[in-house]
Amino acid sequence: MIYSKEIVREWLDEVAERAKDHPEWVDVFERCYTDTLDNTVEILEDGSTFVLTGDIPAMWLRDSTAQLRPYLHVAKRDALLRQTIAGLVKRQMTLVLKDPYANSFNIEENWKGHHETDHTDLNGWIWERKYEVDSLCYPLQLAYLLWKETGETSQFDEIFVVATKEILHLWTVEQDHKNSPYRFVRDTDRKEDTLVNDGFGPDFAVTGMTWSAFRPSDDCCQYSYLIPSNMFAVVVLGYVQEIFAALNLADSQSVIADAKRLQDEIQEGIENYAYITNSKGEKIYAFEVDGLGNASIMDDPNVPSLLAAPYLGYCSVDDEVYQATRRTILSSENPYFYQGEYASGLGSSHTFYRYIWPIALSIQGLTTRDKAEKKFLLDQLVACDGGTGVMHESFHVDDPTLYSREWFSWANMMFCELVLDYLDIR
């Protein structure tokens, strides 16, 4: 059993009662909330949990965490659901040990995915091997939040310890990518799907930050130090120190020391290289930098993003640099900010021109203190569902019936998270 239907039903009724003035939200919320549990989650023979991303038959380390995070509230009551989430952490960490550079995996060693087009060190477990810093942040985040929200500790097993060490090692290696074994070339006409310089990536200088090949959108980085992902790494490295200290896990002293060193060096790199100025002369965060003086002003509509920095726990919503960055991102200075007849928000090179992402709209709502803005965004999300009653990867700002991805569970669950936030269920 994945969860207790009675407990979840009772909780859904409580949410519906609290949101009774917004029945249109409740309708979409219930559909999205139950769909992920009923149609994407599978308990495997070893007791671990596999979470399908939706209409692609694979599990992303990033997406799967975000898909189950909104269930932490009810997992306090539901022991079955707690074990399902703990099982996901176990599956994620097992897969990290299959290959820490991969972003998405198969349910078994079946060699499905991009094996015919991708030139990189593949194995049968890997759906895609695009290295993204955040892919390694998310399992650590879920393990920590599950512990803090519910008290569950079964996820902190030997595999967790070994995988955490592997993550720390990889991030250390990638502080100077010249020492890295990772290369990635795809046979494609789409430049965003492959790395330049024979798979090595663009030029860079050492900064203290950790290198990333691809963004959370699965498009390649223009410059190799992705600031939002390094912010996320700083946060989860703090989680690692807290977990190993509080629970006295194996090799805790050395793991804590390594995590602290990495955290300090990455944070120093952010402070030394991430700050730039916008067109108004305000100090803001760059999206990507290369350590050679180049930087980009934009944002990714996925998470981690600059917009999501407070959501990730990196800074306060009220931080002056964050607020200036937020204003810049949500303006025409960001080349991927689109305004249209039905909506405005963040798009991506990963999707069509003038298509914006519901995930980014949800994050916009989750990173404001303005209740009216949250309500506006929830109303907009429901109105722009293309008549389907669920969220999508992206939709056209002038015609929401034009959208990408019929079934995208991550977007569904980010909508649910914003509803819960609006109702002060945090």
Predicted regions mapped to residue ranges:
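Active-site-adjacent bridging/hinge elements
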Residues: 36-46, 110-119, 203-215, 336, ...
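Well-ordered alpha-helical scaffold segments within catalytic/enzyme domains
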Residues: 7-21, 66-79, 138-153, 231-251, ...
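Aromatic-rich carbohydrate-recognition surfaces in CAZymes
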Residues: 57-85, 89-191, 409-425
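Alpha-helix capping and helix-loop boundary segments enriched in small/acidic/polar residues
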Residues: 123-130, 134, 155-158, 220-224, ...
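Extended, well-ordered alpha-helical scaffold segments
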Residues: 28, 32, 79-95, 152-172, ...
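C-terminal capping/lid segments that line or modulate ligand- or cofactor-binding pockets
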Residues: 118-124, 129-132, 296-316, 354-426
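Low-complexity, Ser/Thr/Pro/Gly-enriched N-terminal "stalk/linker" regions
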Residues: 1-62
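Extended ligand-binding clefts on enzyme/binding-domain cores
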Residues: 61, 97-104, 108, 120, ...
